[in-house]
Curated annotation (Swiss-Prot):
Present with 504 molecules/cell in log phase SD medium. Associates with the mitochondrial ribosome. Keywords: Mitochondrion, Transit peptide. It comes from the Eukaryota. Component of MIOREX complexes, large expressome-like assemblies of ribosomes with factors involved in all the steps of post-transcriptional gene expression. Residues 39-58 have a biased composition (Basic and acidic residues). It is found in: Mitochondrion. This is MIOREX complex component 6. One of its GO terms (cellular component) is mitochondrial matrix. Residues 29-61 are annotated as: Disordered.
Length: 524
């Protein structure tokens, strides 16, 4: 329902919706599911807590100013383009509060925030005609011909209104028969224009004028038929109802609203959509996890602050565990030193190439990287592939700034291609050499299905599967379409409840990664 409401608001309110280019950099908190033979890595845990994801929207440089009239972009000093943008701007554009152009951090991107429809019963929502979802009442210019004679529509109503029977006030409903009004208007319009319509071709035939049009999309009121009708006559007609406008005296220094609110009158459903500026959204949770500003300046709410603190604590605990593994177990520390030595050799090659091109010396500081610990307990082909992929990602993340700078400095395409192939070949040699030498120690034990490890995501754990057949039979067994029930002490009954790829009862023999390093058998 929210998706349909969003589409309707975008389709019928184009003047209030602005489009802008967003960067694709996104930070997501999700459950990982990496399939591989024996070496897959899953995330499990309590997923009931709400996850928040935000977009790194970035900033537009202050030298570039944008005029929000279609897709017009105005640069400083371009007076001709600026004058054209001012001429093309409509006075009814209320979305940006009569501001023709804004620059820098004042860039706006308004999107609708649609209210939830959970409190509305399905019977009311599915009743077409009574409730039109979130489609509002449209009051706008109707498509009448420009040469229409003023007052003509009023005379049409003047001929019809005496024939309308007013309902007695003593009756309960107190409404006029709208269908009779529509039929009278159609009959009058057809009677007056019957001779002219016979002479005109079919393409120029005009449909009869109806003051309003009721459909599943809402009520559409035509302006022209009621433009010259006195107010006392309109007050007696139904379903129209005039709303008294109360103008409040505002102070001169009153703060202007930062968001546009559109009110559509409906007492049954709270139909008040709100346009939110994404660039000034203060509730983003993952924008800067290590922000040094105090909470009062950053603008986080109390709920988001607690979630942010839980995220930071989970990530710090995960990094602390990884460091403890390296300091506690000598074989992990030695393997990490081996990886660091290989990266140091690659850094020297890049530094020599950079000095040859720019005559500058650089020192690419090495950030300590933790190797995947699943390779110490699983020797399957899937784990080997995941390990090589992880090594390649870590190496490319480390050398990417210097590597791209050297490629952009090389002017000759042949030299840049030669340098690129050289670095790629060297990286492949490093990956092959490390995948053969790491892990230096392998742990094994019979009867264990998966290993559980802490996760950087709050309320989650990582699972490293050691037995592929057990994993396949658990999630893709032959009885996935059967309803299996398991009772506990004749009080609680556990059933599949529509979960398709889970087989009950499930028996998994799991152990912690620390237990594997301390108690399992090993060989070098």
């Amino acid at each position: 329902m929210e998706h349909q409401a969003l589409r309707r608001l975008v389709l019928y309110c184009p003047n209030f919706i602005r489009r802008g280019a967003l960067r694709q950099n996104m930070t997501r908190v999700s459950c990982r599911h990496m399939s591989g033979k024996g070496g897959g890595r899953d995330e499990k845990g309590d997923c009931n807590e709400e996850k928040d994801s935000s977009k790194d929207l970035g900033r537009v440089p202050s030298k570039m100013k944008r005029a929000y009239d279609g897709e017009t972009v105005i640069k400083e000093g371009d007076s001709h383009a600026e004058s054209l943008a001012q001429q093309g701007k409509q006075p009814t554009d209320l979305a940006y509060n009569s501001r023709s152009k804004i620059s820098g951090s004042n860039l706006h991107l308004l999107v609708p925030r649609v209210a939830s429809t959970d409190y509305i019963s399905n019977k009311e929502v599915h009743t077409e005609g009574l409730f039109a979802g979130y489609r509002p009442l449209f009051l706008g210019n109707s498509g009448f011909p420009s040469d229409a004679r003023k007052g003509k529509n009023f005379h049409e109503l003047d001929d019809v209104l005496p024939n309308i029977q007013v309902v007695d006030a003593s009756e309960k409903d107190g409404k006029l028969n709208v269908q009779e009004i529509i039929e009278d208007l159609q009959r009058t319009s057809l009677r007056e224009s019957i001779h002219s319509m016979e002479q005109l071709p079919s393409s120029h035939k005009r449909k009869p004028v109806i003051p309003w049009d009721a459909s599943i999309s809402g009520m559409v009121y035509n302006d022209m038929p009621f433009k010259y009708v006195p107010k006392n006559i309109i007050l007696k007609m139904k379903p129209f109802k005039l709303l008294r406008i109360e103008r409040k005296s505002q102070a001169k220094n009153a703060r202007k609203p930062t968001m546009i609110k559109l009110q559509f009158h409906n007492r049954r459903i709270n139909d008040t959509p709100e346009l939110v500026n994404l660039y000034h959204n203060k509730s983003r949770l993952h924008e800067s996890l290590y922000n040094t500003k105090p909470l009062q300046e950053s603008g986080y709410s109390s709920a988001n602050t607690s979630k942010r603190q839980k995220m930071l604590k989970a990530r710090s605990d995960f990094e602390h565990k990884q460091k403890n593994y390296a300091y506690k177990h000598t074989f992990i520390k030695n393997d990490q030193e081996l990886f660091r030595n290989e990266l140091t050799k690659l850094n020297k090659i890049l530094a020599r190439e950079f000095k040859k091109l720019t005559k500058l010396s650089i020192h690419n500081e090495f950030k300590r990287e933790h190797l995947p610990l699943a390779v110490y307990v699983s020797k399957s082909k899937g784990t080997k592939k995941l390990f090589r992929r992880s090594l390649k990602m870590k190496i490319m993340d480390h050398i990417y700034p210097v590597y791209t700078t050297i490629l952009s400095t090389l002017t000759n395409s042949r030299d840049s291609k030669k340098f690129e192939n050289k670095i790629k070949a060297y990286i492949e040699k490093i990956i092959v050499r490390l995948s053969d030498e790491v892990p230096s120690t392998y742990f094994f034990q019979d009867g264990v299905d998966c290993i559980i490890q802490p996760s950087p995501i709050h309320n989650f754990k990582r699972m490293h599967w050691l037995r592929y057949t057990k994993r396949h039979n658990t999630f893709w067994g032959r009885t996935i379409h059967k309803d299996v029930q398991v009772s506990f002490n004749d009080k609680y009954v556990v059933t599949r409840s529509g979960v398709r790829y889970t087989r009950y009862p499930t028996n998994l023999n799991t152990q912690l990664l620390e237990t594997a390093f301390e108690e399992w058998d090993y060989y070098e």
